[in-house]
Amino acid sequence: INGIFIAGYGIKGVAKAVEVKNRSKEIKIICYDNSAFVTDYVKKGVIDAVICQDPEKQGYMALKILSDLIIGDKEVKADTYMTSIDIRLCENIDRDFQEWEI
């Protein structure tokens, strides 16, 4: 195994196992969604990349659009709404990406 992609729960366990077996140089780990422990593992070099999806904004936008349709009787302006996706690495894990929003 030279790479692991984690799209759900289990990030902490996988990262810990790779770290305990001292294989972080051989096994590249990419996962979704940042958290305090993910940031720590990125800084240690155990996790190589994190795809941050902004789940707060995703949830907010979905409920706002639904609320506008049902309660506000407002027309939906588009059939697709995009939220930002940030790729975080060791070099930029601490950077605030909010300022980069378009």
What are the roles of these predicted feature ranges?
Residues 24, 44-45, 82:
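Short, well-ordered coil/turn elements that cap or connect secondary structure elements
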Residues 8, 53-56, 60:
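Electropositive phosphate-/nucleotide-binding environments in soluble metabolic enzymes
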